[in-house]
């Protein structure tokens, strides 16, 4: 991973694709627009581009609710334009890193739709809980956005945890099958030629065993039970050992 430590002194230019240059004339920024501005970006003296989410998404949270981790949203030009940008950036000596968002997915992701139907092996891909014996929510955690962190699912007849929007169910990273999925996502993009990832809310991926109530925090209730959780370092080391160490890449944690 970064054998020559090329990433130590790099300057990255962040691109929020929707607000960048509109290349196809539909009024929204896209990868064609990025491609057309690669010389300009290089002229700024930067060493690489960091893309905010480009994946297919219903758009409940500006693209951070991902419905497919192995594609590029059609509205941004799809995979064809992404490959052109990647090749063009590399030809100009610039690296390309992407956002990696694996604390949660969109509720429209295939995994979640199968999980709520209890279809193996996806049954425990997310954090599902029944109500407490007294009829209350599984715990008293708050969502980072608003309201409580639990949403009832009529189909499964259980609650699912969402630390962010209701449409962003949290993945169950304690499930080794989920961690394997993450590793396959990493391999997919690294094999394509991406140079690394900015890991979004990565400190939230491990929740305290038992998901206990939070009796101390009056605001952001529950955060001490999932921020820098018990297995964060263990899981990140697993991703590094099994995938990242086999590529010349970089990861940056939020």
Locations of regions flagged by a protein language model:
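Conserved protein kinase catalytic-loop anchor
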Residues: 194
């Amino acid at each position: 991973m970064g054998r020559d430590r090329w990433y130590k002194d790099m300057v990255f230019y962040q691109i929020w694709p929707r607000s960048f240059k509109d290349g196809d004339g539909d009024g929204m920024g896209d990868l064609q627009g990025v491609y057309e501005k690669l010389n300009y970006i290089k002229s700024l003296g930067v060493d690489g581009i960091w893309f905010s989410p480009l994946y297919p998404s219903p758009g409940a949270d500006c693209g951070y609710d991902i419905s497919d981790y192995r594609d590029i949203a059609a509205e941004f030009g799809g995979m064809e334009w992404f490959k052109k940008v990647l090749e063009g950036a590399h030809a100009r000596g610039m690296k390309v890193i992407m956002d990696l968002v694996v604390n949660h997915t969109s509720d429209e992701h295939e995994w979640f739709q199968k999980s709520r139907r209890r279809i193996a092996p996806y049954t425990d891909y997310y954090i599902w809980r029944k109500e407490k014996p007294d009829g209350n929510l599984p715990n008293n955690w708050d969502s980072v956005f608003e309201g409580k962190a639990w949403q009832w699912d009529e189909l499964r007849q259980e609650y699912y945890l969402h630390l962010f929007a209701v449409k962003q169910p949290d993945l169950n990273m304690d499930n080794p099958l989920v961690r394997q999925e993450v590793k396959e996502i990493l391999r997919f993009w690294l094999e394509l030629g991406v140079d690394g990832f900015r890991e979004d809310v990565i400190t939230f991926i491990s929740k305290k065993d038992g998901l206990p109530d939070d009796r101390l925090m009056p605001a952001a209730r529950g955060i001490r039970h999932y921020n820098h959780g018990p297995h964060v370092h263990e899981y990140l080391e697993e991703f590094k050992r099994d995938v990242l160490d086999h590529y010349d890449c970089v990861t940056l944690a939020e």
